[in-house]
Amino acid sequence: DAQESRGLGDVYKRQDIVFEGFGGVLCVEAGGPTPGIGCAGRGIISAFEKLEELKAFEIYKPDIVIYDVLGDVVCGGFAMPIRGGYAREVFIVSSGEMMALYAANNIAQAIKNFGRRGYARLKGIILNAKNIENEQELVAKAAAEIETEVVMYVPRSGDIQTAENQGGTVSEFVQASPMVKIYQELADKVLEMSEDTKGDE
């Protein structure tokens, strides 16, 4: 990570932390502290502060911004995209495993608390399948308990690992995979459910 090889007081340029991937997608990896030292949540806060300092949003003008944040630790830093007003909608990605659903419930409770203050809203659960028994039923039940819905079912596929081993996405390296269409459908659904995009239609 960049913060591992440099001191926090060193000067960064945008190109040091913003990388362009397949299809013009820009990616920023927040990184984290040395294991056992420091707070990963604080690293996320620092990343937002640095992006603002470098005026990354104003310069790149992204159409859509997605924050991929760990859900099993709901601390102040990990909630930064919500508390800071950066995110309007939250989609929880979960399998049907017990601990994943437990984390999903915690996230839902945190979002509910933030919602009372006018922050982001929970839009639903994206089921990232692990092929466990009765998985769709388990996740549908969990979604109902937190008063939301299953937005989409994403099946487990070895094509994902095949693409990852080549350092890319299925859209780039396994174009014949049915997962390409599934991810396109998921993207369309997320766009359709996102308030910020409705005024641009």
Each model region followed by its residue ranges:
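Single conserved hydrophobic/aromatic residue that forms the stacking wall/gate
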Residues: 1-12
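Switch I (G2) and immediately adjacent beta-strands of P-loop GTPase domains
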Residues: 13-32
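Residue-level signature of catalytic and energy-coupling elements of molecular machines
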Residues: 28, 47, 68, 104, ...
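Glycine-rich oxoanion-binding loops at beta->alpha junctions
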Residues: 42-46, 50
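Conserved catalytic-core segment of NTP-binding enzymes
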Residues: 53-64, 69-153, 162
